């Protein structure tokens, strides 16, 4: 039977629509398969990311749990403290002020050969290297029968204890915990006026006596109530610490006062007149101060001692090797208040030039490529022992600026022509004992807890 024109048009349209529908159906099936593949890939990616995240969490938890168990089970007083790292502030400032390109281009400029040698700094630089070398270990202690809390810097380079007084009218004191003698029943008046000078300024006040508490230890102790801290600005206002607890030597103190640890031993509160620092490798912003004894779970291998060569500082004799550059019988100061290894400028400039290390102009950053195979293991030789510091301990990648670039935790500081400071990088690798009775410093490789 023949179709009419309208019926034929309808039939053709139906066939075309059916064909189009088949193509659409086929296309949808293909899209569905692609979607399923993508969903499967997303699932795999999610599982991988989640797995890595949980692996990190579990590993971190296990690591912290081991450390927690050591601290929980130790028979010695151990105080956790925070570490205020000046390099963190420098890098934060670089990012905040959008100087990342400036850092990268500075390195490229001096590497390109346009300059005769890498820029190693000058006295006109806008940020003092001494400022970025300053490190703060600060933990909590209390004063008085009512346990007034204070955040102390634990400082091996000074010997007095001071806190701001309620009578302090300096700008910085307005944000601090202030000592109120009238609130403590164990307060004893002294009133002798005193001032202490630091590299960053002078504080003024008067002597008082009250009960000092550190962890589960307490003792009556003569300290300084500070009434004027203006000279410490702007550092004081911008930092979390309230006062300083000196862990140096008596001859370094104002008023000829025994250090807290020595006084604790005299009062039979601890077994030994010593303290130790343990700085975990996995977390550069915390550390642990132990008073009166040595916790063997913080280190591995032998614990070796070096006799002091100075009656004011924790200073020892070492032959120091920076690759081919050697300083015989150098004075090495072991210092909790220094964020880097420091060396005399004339010694360090030669080393940096050979190692293709440059200083970023107007910033306290010494930079090289992270794959710089020329960087040596630093060696520190005593008469009977050798201590080493591999590049991984004295350099860190500038991840937020350029992952290919690393900064060095080595700075030029001129105390004299043969004095080095072994600060945070050295003490992070080596568990360190400061022993008043042996007049020695002890080192052992720190465990990675």
UniProtKB/Swiss-Prot annotation:
Gene Ontology CC entries for this record: food vacuole; membrane; vacuolar lumen
Modifications made to the protein after synthesis: Proteolytically cleaved into the soluble active mature form by cysteine proteases in the digestive vacuole of trophozoites. Proteolysis requires an acidic environment. Autoprocessing or transprocessing by other plasmepsins such as PMII may serve as an alternate activation system.
Residue numbers on the Lumenal membrane side: 59-449
Propeptide: 1-121
Keyword Transmembrane helix: yes
Peptidase A1 domain segment(s): 137-444
Description of how activity is regulated: Inhibited by pepstatin A.
Keywords: Aspartyl protease, Disulfide bond, Hydrolase, Membrane, Protease, Signal-anchor, Transmembrane, Transmembrane helix, Vacuole, Zymogen
One Pfam family in the UniProt entry: Asp
Membrane topology: Single-pass type II membrane protein
Transmembrane helix listed as a keyword: yes
GO biological process, one term: acquisition of nutrients from host
Location(s), subcellular: Membrane; Vacuole lumen
Main localization category: membrane
Residues annotated as the enzyme's active site: 155, 335
Catalytic activity: Hydrolysis of the bonds linking certain hydrophobic residues in hemoglobin or globin. Also cleaves small molecules substrates such as Ala-Leu-Glu-Arg-Thr-Phe-|-Phe(NO2)-Ser-Phe-Pro-Thr
GO molecular function: aspartic-type endopeptidase activity
Spans through the membrane: 38-58
Cysteine pairs bridged by disulfides in the record: 168-173, 370-406
Biological role stated in the UniProt entry: During the asexual blood stage, catalyzes the cleavage of denatured host hemoglobin (Hb) or globins. Digestion of host Hb is an essential step which provides the parasite with amino acids for protein synthesis, and regulates osmolarity.
Family membership noted in the UniProt record: Belongs to the peptidase A1 family.
Complex and partners: Component of the hemozoin formation complex (HFC) composed of falcipains FP2A and/or FP2B, plasmepsins PMII, PMIII/HAP and PMIV, heme detoxifying protein HDP and falcilysin FLN. The HFC complex is involved in hemoglobin degradation and detoxification of heme in the food vacuole during the asexual blood stage.
Protein name, per record: Plasmepsin IV
Organism: Plasmodium falciparum (isolate HB3)
């Amino acid at each position: 039977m023949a179709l009419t024109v309208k019926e034929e048009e309808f039939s053709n349209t139906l066939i075309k629509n059916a064909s189009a529908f088949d193509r659409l159906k086929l296309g949808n099936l293909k899209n569905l398969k692609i979607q399923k593949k993508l969903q499967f890939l997303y699932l795999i990616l999610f599982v991988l990311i989640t797995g890595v995240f949980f692996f990190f969490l579990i590993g971190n938890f296990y690591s912290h749990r081991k450390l927690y168990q050591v601290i929980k089970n130790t028979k010695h007083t151990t105080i956790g403290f925070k570490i205020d790292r000046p390099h963190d502030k420098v890098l934060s400032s670089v990012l905040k002020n959008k100087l990342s390109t400036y850092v990268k281009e500075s390195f490229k400029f001096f590497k390109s050969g346009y300059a005769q040698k890498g820029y190693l700094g000058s006295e006109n630089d806008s940020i003092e290297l001494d400022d970025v070398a300053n490190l703060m270990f600060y933990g909590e202690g209390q004063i008085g029968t009512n346990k007034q809390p204070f955040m102390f810097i634990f400082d091996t380079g000074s010997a007095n204890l001071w806190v701001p007084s309620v009578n302090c009218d300096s700008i910085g004191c307005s944000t601090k915990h202030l000592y109120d003698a009238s609130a403590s029943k164990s307060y004893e008046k002294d009133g002798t006026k005193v001032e202490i000078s630091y590299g960053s300024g002078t504080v003024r006040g008067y002597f008082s006596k009250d009960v000092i508490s550190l962890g589960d230890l307490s003792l009556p102790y003569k300290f300084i109530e500070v009434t004027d801290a203006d000279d410490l600005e702007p550092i004081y206002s911008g930092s979390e610490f309230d006062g300083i607890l000196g862990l140096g030597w008596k001859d370094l103190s104002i008023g000829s006062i025994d250090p807290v640890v020595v006084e604790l031993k005299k009062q039979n509160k601890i077994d030994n007149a010593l303290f130790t620092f343990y700085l975990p490798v996995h977390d550069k912003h915390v550390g642990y101060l132990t008073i009166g004894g040595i916790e063997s779970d913080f280190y591995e291998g032998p614990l070796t001692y070096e006799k002091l060569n100075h009656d004011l500082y924790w200073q020892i004799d070492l032959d120091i090797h920076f690759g081919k550059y050697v300083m015989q019988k150098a004075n090495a100061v072991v210092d909790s208040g220094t964020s880097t290894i420091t060396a005399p400028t004339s010694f360090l400039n030669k080393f940096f030039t050979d190692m293709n290390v440059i200083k970023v102009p107007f910033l306290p950053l010494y930079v090289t490529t992270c794959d710089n195979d020329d960087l040596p293991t630093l060696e520190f030789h005593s008469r009977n022992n050798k201590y080493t510091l591999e590049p991984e301990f004295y350099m860190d990648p500038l991840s937020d600026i350029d992952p290919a670039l690393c900064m060095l935790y080595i700075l030029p500081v001129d105390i004299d022509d043969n004095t080095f400071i072994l600060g945070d990088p050295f003490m992070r690798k080596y568990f360190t004992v400061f022993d008043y009775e042996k007049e020695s410093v002890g080192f052992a490789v720190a465990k990675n807890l």
